[in-house]
Curated annotation (Swiss-Prot):
Biological role: Part of a signaling cascade that regulates curli biosynthesis. The cascade is composed of two cyclic-di-GMP (c-di-GMP) control modules, in which c-di-GMP controlled by the DgcE/PdeH pair (module I) regulates the activity of the DgcM/PdeR pair (module II), which in turn regulates activity of the transcription factor MlrA and expression of the master biofilm regulator csgD. DgcM stimulates activity of MlrA by direct interaction, leading to the transcription of csgD.
SUPFAM superfamilies, alphabetized: Nucleotide cyclase, PYP-like sensor domain (PAS domain)
GO biological process, one term: cell adhesion involved in single-species biofilm formation
Subunit field text: Forms homodimers and homotetramers. Interacts with PdeR and MlrA.
Keywords: GTP-binding, Magnesium, Metal-binding, Nucleotide-binding, Repeat, Transferase
Regulation: Activity is inhibited by the phosphodiesterase PdeR. Inhibition is relieved by high cellular c-di-GMP levels.
Protein name: Diguanylate cyclase DgcM
Gene Ontology terms: cellular component: plasma membrane
Organism: Escherichia coli (strain K12)
Residues of the PAC domain: 199-251
Record-listed Mg(2+) binding positions: D291, E334
Cofactor binding annotation: Binds 1 Mg(2+) ion per monomer.
EC class name: transferase
């Protein structure tokens, strides 16, 4: 990472964060931004109680930002020792030809931009005109909301009534916080949206339907004046199926298909320096490397399906022995890894012995009992993860050479 002089940004009264999208690493925050962060990390700003975005992962914004699309996120920040919402405009810049960054610029709306009290209690949609035709014929669910009346829904088109499962009268007795799973926490977010310039902004929420079920939605919401009333128009798109597919793909990317455990790729992601700091396991942790003894013999003699049964049974045993906070990975083949946060060597050795004994008791129909050998190592000083893994691998190698079915420390 090339170091740049960002100190001139401290002259700005609006908060600015400069973030590396791929690691979600904060490169710089100006003075105004630091005041709003207190002791929070940037990731916590994006995942707080008032945080709303259209993308969970920052790299997914890159294409739209390159095409100069207007993207807004709402962060959870600290003001006067209280959490509140802050809208940010996202801009893509390059520190070098190969080093893109995303700038989060806080949009501090003047008080005079707020939506003033409307006359929406007397609102009645006219039967003719452009708005009536647009509202009635649109196939997307549309809600008209009055922020000045506690988020009262004052109108809904037929698509919205069909989507939420209410008749028009009942729908217009509800407030936006009654259909949003954030509850009243959505109110500061709604008021932030009411200040945003430049049209409607896509943000993701979870909405509750009349039958009690929930749907993931992407909403385009922004201020609008209709018949003299200052309101908010919210266009709703159901993205539940899209979210389900994204979650399935994300799970498949991070987990082993056969055992359901975390995979080697996720191990290296978690053990990146920035991730280790976030998980508070940067120093005091231990590693177990577990290998199934004579696994090739099991495959050759009893078949690969029985070998798969052994691996799945071993995976379940490791999960049952693991403590809260321990992470279990399938490393590949018949090898597994346990990452033990805040665990000294003697505790790691004790847990490894518990695993060894437990595995020896596992019974699978049509198979003799099987055993494991385990290497154990505790992270030392500034040791890299590769250096640590070499030590634990050497310990496992010695355990196998010394007769298998045993635990050895590096």
């Amino acid at each position: 990472m090339i170091t740049h002089n960002f100190n001139t940004l401290d002259l700005l009264t609006s908060p600015v964060w400069i973030v590396s999208p791929f690691e979600e690493q904060l490169i710089y925050a100006n003075s105004a931004a630091k005041l709003l962060m207190q002791d929070l990390t940037f990731s916590q700003l994006r995942t707080g109680p008032y945080s709303v975005s259209s993308q969970k992962e920052l790299p997914k914004y890159l294409s739209d930002l390159q095409n100069q699309h207007d993207i807004i996120e709402i962060l959870t920040v600290q003001r006067k020792e209280e959490e509140t919402a802050l809208s940010c405009r996202l801009v893509l810049r390059k520190l070098t030809e190969t080093e893109p960054v995303i700038i989060f610029e806080g949009i501090e709306a003047p008080a005079t931009l707020g939506l003033k009290a409307s006359r929406s209690a007397n609102y009645q949609r006219k039967k003719q005109g452009f708005y009536a035709r647009f509202f009635l014929t649109n196939s997307a669910p549309m809600l008209l909301i009055d922020p000045s009346r506690d988020g009262q829904i004052v109108d809904a088109n037929l698509a919205a009534l069909n989507f939420y499962g209410y008749n028009h009268e009942t729908m217009c007795q509800k407030h936006t916080w009654e259909i949003n799973m954030l509850g009243r926490r959505v109110m500061p977010i709604m008021h932030e949206i009411s200040h945003l310039p430049g049209g409607h902004k896509p943000l993701n929420f979870v909405h509750k339907l009349a039958d009690g079920s929930t749907r993931h939605v992407q909403t385009y919401a922004g201020p609008i004046e209709i018949y003299g009333d200052k309101l908010m128009l919210c266009i709703v798109h159901d993205i539940t199926e899209q979210k389900r597919l994204e979650e399935q793909l994300e799970h498949a990317a991070h987990h082993d298909a056969m055992t359901g455990l975390l995979n080697r790729r996720q191990f290296y992601h978690i053990t990146e320096p920035g991730q280790m700091q976030h998980l508070a396991i940067a120093q005091d942790y231990s590693l177990l490397l577990i290998d199934t003894d004579r696994f090739k013999h099991i495959n050759d003699l009893y078949g690969h399906s029985k070998g798969d049964e052994v691996l799945c049974a071993l995976a379940r045993t490791l999960e049952s022995c693991a403590r809260k906070g321990d992470l279990v990975f399938r490393w590949g083949g018949e090898e597994f890894v346990l990452l033990l946060p805040r665990t000294p060597l003697d505790t790691a050795l004790s847990l490894a012995e518990t695993i060894r004994v437990s595995v020896a008791k596992v019974s699978i129909s049509g198979l003799p009992r099987f055993t494991v050998s385990i290497g154990v190592a505790h992270h030392e000083g500034n040791e890299s993860i590769d250096e640590l893994f070499k030590r634990v691998d050497d310990a496992l190698y010695r355990a196998k050479n010394d007769g298998r079915n045993r635990v050895l420390a590096a």
